[in-house]
Amino acid sequence: MTQVLVRNGIQAVGDGLTSLIIVGKKSVLKNVTFEGKFKEVAQKFVTDGDSWNSMISRIPASGRHPLHYELAHLITVPDASSRGNTPTNAHSIYKELKPINYPEDTKNVHFVLFAEYPDVLSHVAAIARTFCKFSMKTSGIRELNVNIDVVCDKLTNEDAVFLTDLSESVRETARLIDTPANILTTDALVDEAVKVGNATGSKITVIRGEELLKAGFGGIYHVGKAGPTPPAFVVLSHEVPGSTEHIALVGKGVVYDTGGLQIKTKTGMPNMKRDMGGAAGMLEAYSALVKHGFSQTLHACLCIVENNVSPIANKPDDIIKMLSGKTVEINNTDAEGRLILADGVFYAKETLKATTIFDMATLTGAQAWLSGRLHGAAMTNDEQLENEIIKAGKASGDLVAPMLFAPDLFFGDLKSSIADMKNSNLGKMDGPPSAVAGLFIGAHIGFGEGLRWLHLDIAAPAEVGDRGTGYGPALFSTLLGKYTSVPMLKQ
């Protein structure tokens, strides 16, 4: 299994064939001198300082430049960016790295990352997510030793340890997303959560199967009751006495979404194994934060189901009662994510007494029309929180764009004549579909009245091509990092 290790400064690598990847913005690279440890690792591919200086002066401001029969590469990261992009331009690193085919006998991939302090986290995360963990090819998974040596005066050893853990969290998120539902069943995802809970010394609560119905979790139970393995609600709690903040990370964990009785098409159903990307990202964000001295109370709440077809599955026209006590007329069995998240956020508010609630989900296909394939779409009742998560998105590379929060204008789109609300609007609506879906969740906690609530739809940025991106841990580590002991997260 490939391991990714982040180190403070340039260091030696292990024995065997090594591929060298030099990464940095051109404005930073032009100040790099060909001497010392950099010369030691680069001189196999760049003959001398004059050659280095000549190359840096002539290469384009962005792109990948193969060196020495493609055993080494120089990646220049654009300095300029638009207002809606991240100034770190982290996506360009992923774009340039992903096509590289390392020579068959490569043992080590040695990254030398020259970066300014604010850019380091997003650049490391972009590099890490190119090394996918899941594969069932009979040829096996290549085992590489990946070292990311960061050259940055302000970087501390504690930063480097955190970045190693963050890299693992990003890659674990992607692994969970890439794992098919015949392997990552609801039971298996519960086991993954329990493993994280044990590793972080967390309090673990698991409510499963018929226990959900008895406890009133109507959304989670009724969506998941038709699945081959039982639905579950898992809470990991990092409780700090005297906390002034009680934060809940709520994730949608639909291990497979057939659409239910209103079944998806033959082209719409493939890749629905990824519908647990919100739960995966929140689980691994929780792990990264708690491992590094999170000083406030933090909970991860995972709503885990398989939305399948059976004689007992939810039917259009069914009315179910939610944990909030509200009733919902189901008119769309493929609008299941909002049903399970509504139970999750209500539990976070009423049982965990959370002062801030985040929910994250691969919720709506319409999200890509609202904010594109690279930006998650955020809706919140708190303008300051909206600004904070957009800023964190730019710093982390997990980009975020705002969507409208206007329950007084748009919640009427879910009006029902026989229940408190419908779970979707199948006709013309006043609100954007992704925002209306988010408002359904918020309706069960009074649209965040008395607390801060943010809903994040990541249907598009959770994936790229055939792979998960690991979206989430970098974003929430940056957003909530001020409560950790990591210097780079406190800037």
From Swiss-Prot:
Signal peptide: none
Record's keyword annotation contains Ribosomal protein: no
Bilayer-spanning residue ranges: none
CDD domains attached to this UniProt entry: Peptidase_M17 (cd00433)
Active site: 264, 338
Stated role: Probably acts as a digestive enzyme.
Protein name: Leucine aminopeptidase 1
Protein source organism: Caenorhabditis elegans
Lineage: Eukaryota, Metazoa, Ecdysozoa, Nematoda, Chromadorea
Gene giving rise to this polypeptide: lap-1
